[in-house]
């Protein structure tokens, strides 16, 4: 379970106010001196009781505007001294950026972020000149929920402690290869209504596939920090599987095969997972991560900002570079009133789950965009489908393994990459960007490669990952070897 490490953040609002007063020059000091003399002169007391001057009102207004902007919108003085600007830029370059990958939860729609990951990995190979480049080489932290959690384990899990097991193309292919075994040919809703249980056969298939993929690997066998959520029925609360916690104690180290099953154990689709840590001390009865955290971006950002042990030089969101991959807003053609007014509880089950998950994910997107403020466009990228011309869509598209649904989702994935990127705007809803999602991913790949190259020339390492000692028998006897890890 992930424990947040809190540390007070020093505000710079006071410095901004002092800078503004200083810009006003000696006027403020002269006024203060004159006021002191007036208090020693009884004839001046009436003057002190007069209404404030227009200049004083203006100064007060500007000061309070700075304070308001700082604490509400992350304001920074827009006109610092030129020399200080150069120094600040140099220091920021030395700090570098922590690169974060976040993947939303979902079912068959996981084909969409899988295709985006495949394109990004291709772009990384092209821009770096390294044909063996992998997603894990360029990201410092990865978080995934549901199918996104499985993708995270696939891209960052390692058998040799050096290279990841899977390529980005393996993610979406995992879904297309195993769809019928996981969801069955008849469709989950029909099976539930006919037999009363739609999850036994899918659970057996998921357990088999995860065991084949990860064997006895645990959270310690991931190359970088990973965060994968589930909902723990035992404690009635979210449970966040974390590599950082696993390296601290075996009581928080779990097998990756069980972690993946836990985060994807959507009620009614797959059975809950009863699991325990490798030392048997921590127990959990898990259902899907989407119930607790359909969009884990905020959890990943919080992990970095409060983890000074592994990310010692991070000062704020301006030191982050975040890619968040969503499942897409595709249900824009359904739900006519005359139709849904006749629905019973069984008809609402799947649509309600989709609305809840997508709504929660969108809320996190809005909140994260607000947190980044003025550096949103340069430090935070959200990629997901924004509608599609290939519908109409069924509320059961996440659990429909049919060839027609798979082919449609493959087409939507290609359409998504060509669509204009959509950004969340502070208090302003959504804004269509000039760049397409293809172009955004190309730009991001360039930034990731540049950050990777700069780390070799910095005075101090940007990250200081606690390392796990790899053992040939894949068991979990690990220790902190005190190594400061530069990027692979």
Swiss-Prot record:
Recite the other comments: Plants over-expressing PLP7 have decreased cellulose content and mechanical strength.
Residues annotated as catalytic: 145
Quote the subcellular location field of this record.
Cell membrane
The protein's UniProt keywords, in alphabetical order, are:
Cell membrane, Growth regulation, Hydrolase, Lipid degradation, Lipid metabolism, Membrane
Question: Which superkingdom is the protein from?
Answer: Eukaryota
Give positions of region: Disordered: 23-49
Q: Which Pfam families does the record match to this protein?
A: Patatin
What does the record say about tissue specificity?
A: Highly expressed in roots and at lower levels in leaves, stems, flowers and siliques.
Q: Where is this motif: GXGXXG?
A: 105-110
> Domain note for this entry?
The nitrogen atoms of the two glycine residues in the GGXR motif define the oxyanion hole, and stabilize the oxyanion that forms during the nucleophilic attack by the catalytic serine during substrate cleavage.
Q: Which GO terms describe its biological process?
A: galactolipid metabolic process; lipid catabolic process; phospholipid metabolic process; response to other organism
Gene3D superfamilies on file: Cytosolic phospholipase A2 catalytic domain
What is this protein's record name? Answer: Patatin-like protein 7
Q: Any phenotype upon disruption?
A: Increased length of leaves, petioles, hypocotyls, primary roots and root hairs. Changes in lipid levels and composition.
Q: What class of enzyme is it?
A: hydrolase
Primary localization: membrane
């Amino acid at each position: 379970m992930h424990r947040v490490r809190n540390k007070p953040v020093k505000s710079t609002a006071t410095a901004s106010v002092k800078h503004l007063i200083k810009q006003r020059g000696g006027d403020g000091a002269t006024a203060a001196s004159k006021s002191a003399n007036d208090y020693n002169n009884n004839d001046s007391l009436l003057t002190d009781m007069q209404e404030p001057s227009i200049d004083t009102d203006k100064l007060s207004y500007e000061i309070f505007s700075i304070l308001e902007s700082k604490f509400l919108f992350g304001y920074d003085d827009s006109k610092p001294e030129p020399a200080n600007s150069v120094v600040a830029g140099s220091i920021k370059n030395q700090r570098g950026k922590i690169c974060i990958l976040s993947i939303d939860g979902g079912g068959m729609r996981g084909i969409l972020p899988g295709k985006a990951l495949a394109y990004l990995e291709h772009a990384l190979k092209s821009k770096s000149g390294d044909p063996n480049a992998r997603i894990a080489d360029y990201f410092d932290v990865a978080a995934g929920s549901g199918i996104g959690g499985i993708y995270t384990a696939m891209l960052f899990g390692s058998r040799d402690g050096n290279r990841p097991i899977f390529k980005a193309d393996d993610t979406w292919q995992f879904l297309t290869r195993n769809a019928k075994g996981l969801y069955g040919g008849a469709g989950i809703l029909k099976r539930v209504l006919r037999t009363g249980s739609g999850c036994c056969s899918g659970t057996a298939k998921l357990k088999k596939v995860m065991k084949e993929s990860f064997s006895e690997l645990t959270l310690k066998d991931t190359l970088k920090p990973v965060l994968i959520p589930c909902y723990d029925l035992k404690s009635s609360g979210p449970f966040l599987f974390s590599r950082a916690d696993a390296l601290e104690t075996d009581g928080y180290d779990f097998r990756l095969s069980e972690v993946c099953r836990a985060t994807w154990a959507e009620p009614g689709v797959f059975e809950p997972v009863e699991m325990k840590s490798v030392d048997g001390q921590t127990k959990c009865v898990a259902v899907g991560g989407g119930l607790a955290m359909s969009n884990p971006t905020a959890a990943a950002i919080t992990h970095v900002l409060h983890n000074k042990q592994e990310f010692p030089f991070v000062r704020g969101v301006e030191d982050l570079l975040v890619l968040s991959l969503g499942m897409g807003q595709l249900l824009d053609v359904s739900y006519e009133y005359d139709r849904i007014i006749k629905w019973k509880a069984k008809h609402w089950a799947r649509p309600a789950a989709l609305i809840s998950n997508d709504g929660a994910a969108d809320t996190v997107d809005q909140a994260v965009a607000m947190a980044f403020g003025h550096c949103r466009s340069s430090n935070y990228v959200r990629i997901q489908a924004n509608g599609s011309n290939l519908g109409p869509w069924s509320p059961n598209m996440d659990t429909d393994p049919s060839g027609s649904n798979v082919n449609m989702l493959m087409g939507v994935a290609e359409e998504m990459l060509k669509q204009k990127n959509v950004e969340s705007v502070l208090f302003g809803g959504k804004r269509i960007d000039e760049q397409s999602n293809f172009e955004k991913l190309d730009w991001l790949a360039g930034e990731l490669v540049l950050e990777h190259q700069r780390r070799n020339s910095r005075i101090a390492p940007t990250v200081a990952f606690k390392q796990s000692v790899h053992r040939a028998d894949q068991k979990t006897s690990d220790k902190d070897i005190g190594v400061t890890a530069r990027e692979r």
